[in-house]
C-alpha cells in the first residue's frame, strides 16, 4: 500500500482556530487542515477530510449492501412539478433552494429525494413480486439554512446517504425498518460513535413513526429525554413524562374576574399583590396552524413544544400569531389571554391540566384575569380537546417506569421514517398485490449525514492536543516519523513504512525536515491512531517507539515486529 509523504502532502495546519469557531469539531477540522470555508455554510473538503469521508461512505455502503440495498445516483436538480405532486413544493418554504431555467421553468436543488425515488418506483415497479426493494444513494443535498454555524454541523451543502424501502404491506415495512435500524447501529458502532436511538418527530417527512440516532454532546442542538432505568429515550419534540399531581383546593363555583393592571407575564402574576405560583397559572398561547388560529394551553411554568403542536393539529406548518392577529380573535392582547368558554378557534389543552382546579388565567380583557378556573368545567366542557403540548423537563417521571428522566443535548447523525403510503398515494405509485388489486407501495425513508458522522466522532474523541480518531475513519492508520536528520534513521523509517504498506496499513510518512517536537504536535493534532518514531537510541537496540493516540504510553517495539503489531491493531479496531 502506497504511503503518503508529509513533505508532498497538502496539510495546511493552523496554530489557532478561527475566531468564529465555537464547537470542537469546527475548530479542529480547520486547524488540522481538513476543511476551509468558502461561504456561509459552504466548505471545501481538503485531502485529509476526503480520506476520512471516503471511509465513512465505505462503511455505509457495506452495511447498506448487507441488507440488500442497491446503490443509485439520482439528480440533485429537480423540476418543481414532481415536488408539487407530493404537495411539498410549498411546504419546504425558504429552506429549499429554488431557481428558474432560461425558459422560466421552476426547479429546486434537492434537500431529500423521496419524490424522485417514488417517481422511479412508480414508473418501473408493477407487481408485488418485485418487492421488497431497498434503494439508496450517497449524494449531495442542499438546504438554505438560515443560520449556518458550528462547522459541518449546520451547513447549506452536505452529503447524505438516503435510502428508501418499497414493500407491498405494513408488515413488510416493519421488517425493512428494523433492517435499517440494525444496519444503522452497525454503521455508527464501526465509526466509533456512542449513540442512542430515540423516538422522534417526523416533521415535513410525514409518516407514522420515526427514530433518530443521537450522539450525546454539548455541541448538539437537539434535546433528548432519557430514562437510565428502562432506557426509554425520545427527542423532546415527542417525549412524554409523568408529572406529579398538584393538590388543588375545591376552587370556586364559577371563575371570578379580578383586576391585574400592567400584569402581562407569568412572572409578574407571581409577584405581590397577586402572588399566584406559575404552576397554578394557565399559559394561553395563540398560534397559526396552516394559517388557521389555534389556542394552546399549558401550565404557567411549562413550555409549549411547537413540534408537538404541529403533530396535534396535523398542520404542515405552525407559527406564533403576530401581535396584531391576536386582539381581533381574543378580544385582548397577549398577557391577558385565556381559553375559558372560548369557542372562536380550536383549543388544545395539555393533558397534565385535565383535572386542575382553582387555576388562574387571562380574562380576554386587557388588565384582567380569572381565578377559580376548573379546567374540565370551564375549558374542556366547551369544546377544547386534550393534546400533548408541553416540553418535558429533567427530573420528571419516566412514562414507562418509576424512573426519572434525564434531559441532555444531542447531535442527530441519522433518522429513519416509516412513510407508509404518504408519497405513493399522492404520486400514484402502485403495484398489483397477490390478489390482483392495485395497492399503493408502502415506503420507508432512511437518512445519514456523512459529514455529521465525521464531526460527531471528533466531538466525542478529542483532547487538548487535537483529534483522537477512531481507527475506522482516521485519514491514516499510522504515522511514521524520525527523531533526527541522520540518514540511517531515514533509511530505517523507509523500511518500516514499506513493511507497514505490505501489511495493508495506511501510513502518513512524516519525512519533513522539522524538529521531533513539531512532528509530535502535528501527529496529535491530526489524530492519527498509531505513532511510530524512529530514533538513534532505540534503533541501536533494534527498536522503534510505538504510541497510540488514544492515551497510550510509549512502548519500544522491535523493528521487525512493528508492522505486524500495527496490522493487528488496525484489524482489531476496524
Curated annotation (Swiss-Prot):
PROSITE patterns membership: AA_TRNA_LIGASE_II
Signal peptide: none
Family label: Belongs to the class-II aminoacyl-tRNA synthetase family. ProS type 1 subfamily.
Annotated EC: 6.1.1.15
EC class name: ligase
Catalytic activity, as annotated: tRNA(Pro) + L-proline + ATP = L-prolyl-tRNA(Pro) + AMP + diphosphate
One example GO MF annotation: proline-tRNA ligase activity
Cross-referenced HAMAP family: Pro_tRNA_synth_type1
Keywords: Aminoacyl-tRNA synthetase, ATP-binding, Cytoplasm, Ligase, Nucleotide-binding, Protein biosynthesis
A GO cellular component entry from the record: cytosol
This protein's domain notes: Consists of three domains: the N-terminal catalytic domain, the editing domain and the C-terminal anticodon-binding domain.
Chief localisation class: cytoplasm
tRNA-binding keyword on record: no
Subunit structure: Homodimer.
Role played: Catalyzes the attachment of proline to tRNA(Pro) in a two-step reaction: proline is first activated by ATP to form Pro-AMP and then transferred to the acceptor end of tRNA(Pro). As ProRS can inadvertently accommodate and process non-cognate amino acids such as alanine and cysteine, to avoid such errors it has two additional distinct editing activities against alanine. One activity is designated as 'pretransfer' editing and involves the tRNA(Pro)-independent hydrolysis of activated Ala-AMP.
A Gene Ontology biological process term: prolyl-tRNA aminoacylation
Location in the cell: Cytoplasm
SUPFAM superfamilies attached to this UniProt entry: Class II aaRS ABD-related, Class II aaRS and biotin synthetases, YbaK/ProRS associated domain
Protein name as annotated: Proline--tRNA ligase
Domain of life: Bacteria
UniProt organism field: Anaeromyxobacter sp. (strain K)
Entry annotated with the keyword Transcription regulation: no
InterPro entries (UniProt xref): aa-tRNA-synt_IIb, aa-tRNA-synth_II, aa-tRNA-synth_II/BPL/LPL, Anticodon-bd, Anticodon-bd_dom_sf, Pro-tRNA-ligase_IIa, Pro-tRNA-synth_IIa_bac-type, Pro-tRNA-Synthase_IIa_type1
CDD domains registered for this protein in UniProt: ProRS-INS (cd04334), ProRS_anticodon_short (cd00861), ProRS_core_prok (cd00779)
Pfam families referenced in this protein's UniProt entry, alphabetically: HGTP_anticodon, tRNA-synt_2b, tRNA_edit
